[in-house]
């Protein structure tokens, strides 16, 4: 992550904490220890409890996901109402920038609210169950950055999910941060099945984003676009990744490795690959379990890919 991108995170957090926050509101940091954080790091939850006092740290009950409370996410109060945030705020922004393309995020976001931490924590925990799929699936950790970005993209009235949180700044999965504003409740929250299904495949979307980020750092002769910024990803990258996975799924692919392979080739070679008869044939065989796409595509040379791309319409955008 470049220093310019890191500075962007720091500026976003500073503006959120000092310009958007009202005098009666506290600033909270949401951390997920499941991502792993060295105990000696100043943003380790134990270190924050010692530095800020145990009353500044409130755990979010995720007992349906993990039994040990020490592994539950934590809501950390970085600033009381009317107080300026400490140096921990820019430090957390730097940490978020460094893990922008990671599979797991220790820093999940910054929240402002005039409500007590225990009420906010309880609400976040309850929404984990509201948004989850039926058994045997567990709760939905909707507060994770990419999952939150996907929720905003798929749920029309997503702002109703925030409850006591007036505003939530979160990494957006594309290399920057976005502000998520609360909306007033309009009755009981209706969660369409498509929203739940997207959360169910979120791990595949996160995996695809990570691979896309790594591949974008390498020059590919057939890549239709190169995006500015250190992440190498376009705006709304999680939504693009979600749409590509849906396209692969609709073509009959079910094997996770095949889906990832097909999506990465659509990203790095041409977004309309599935329209080409040769690729359609390969996908049909993979869907039938007769081959794996990675093995088959490995036999294609640059000449083969150039011929395939030449037979497709000009790439205008990702799905």
Describe these PLM feature segments.
Residues 2-52, 56-70, 75, 113-319:
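A contiguous, surface-oriented mixed alpha/beta subdomain in the mid-to-C-terminal portion of proteins
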Residues 70-120:
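A broadly used, surface-exposed interaction patch
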């Amino acid at each position: 992550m470049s220093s310019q991108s890191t500075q962007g995170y720091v500026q976003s957090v500073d503006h959120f904490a000092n310009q958007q926050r009202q005098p009666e509101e506290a600033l909270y940091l949401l951390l997920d220890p499941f991502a792993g954080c060295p105990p000696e790091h100043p943003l380790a939850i134990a270190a924050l409890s010692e530095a800020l006092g145990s009353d500044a740290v409130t755990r979010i009950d995720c007992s349906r996901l993990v039994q040990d409370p020490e592994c539950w996410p934590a809501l950390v109060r970085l600033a009381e109402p009317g107080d300026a945030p400490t140096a921990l705020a820019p430090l957390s922004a730097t940490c978020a920038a460094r893990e922008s393309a990671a599979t797991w995020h220790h820093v999940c976001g910054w929240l402002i609210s005039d409500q007590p931490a225990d009420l906010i924590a309880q609400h976040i925990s309850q929404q984990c169950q509201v948004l989850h799929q039926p058994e045997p699936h567990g709760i939905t950790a909707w507060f994770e950055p990419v999952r939150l970005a996907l929720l905003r993209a798929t749920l029309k009235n997503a702002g109703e999910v925030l409850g006591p949180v007036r505003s939530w700044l979160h990494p957006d999965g594309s290399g920057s941060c976005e502000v998520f504003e609360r909306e007033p409740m309009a009755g009981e929250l209706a969660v369409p099945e498509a929203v739940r299904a997207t959360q169910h495949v979120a791990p595949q979307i996160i995996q695809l984003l990570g691979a896309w980020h790594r591949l974008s750092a390498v020059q590919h002769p057939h890549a239709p676009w190169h995006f500015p910024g250190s992440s190498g990803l376009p705006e709304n990258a999680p939504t693009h990744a979600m749409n590509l996975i849906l396209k692969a799924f609709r073509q009959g692919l079910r094997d996770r490795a095949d889906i990832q392979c097909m999506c990465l080739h659509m990203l790095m070679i041409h977004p309309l690959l599935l329209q080409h008869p040769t690729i359609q044939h390969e996908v049909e065989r993979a869907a039938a379990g007769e081959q794996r796409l990675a093995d088959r595509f490995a036999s294609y040379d640059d000449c083969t890919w150039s011929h395939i791309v030449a037979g497709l319409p000009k790439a205008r955008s990702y799905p």
